[in-house]
Amino acid sequence: MYTEAARVYSLKRLCGDETSKDKFAQIGEIMSESHRSCRTLYQCSSEELDELVELAMENGAYGARLTGAGWGGCIVAYVSENNKNKFIENIYCSYYKKHLDAGKITQKQLKNCIFPSKPSAGACVIVLGSSDPVNP
């Protein structure tokens, strides 16, 4: 757990560093290190998640890792905005199509399987009557 916490602090420092070169690659490497740790040290990955992470990296992700509780959940991949549509199409063709064709997922379920998202502020405390949700 210590190394994962250290990665969180490294990521925070990196995101705040305006002078950092190759920031996308560095952030991606932190994500990939996190996945390797989950897979190797904590054994909370699965063959399917490892395959998705590998395919993500082969298709231009800066980094990828399992997210959620593991043992079957999902991955998050760090992809450039201009590559996201091609990335989604490639992951669909190389992973999800075979599961769709085999009847393991339906077309309706597929819409919930792969989609773009953006970073957000995350969880916070909101004090009613305060205009600042972070520092009430």
Each language-model region and where it sits:
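C-terminal nucleotide
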Residues: M1-G63, A77-P136
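Conserved phosphate/anionic-ligand binding catalytic regions in large, soluble enzymes, centered on
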Residues: A64-C74
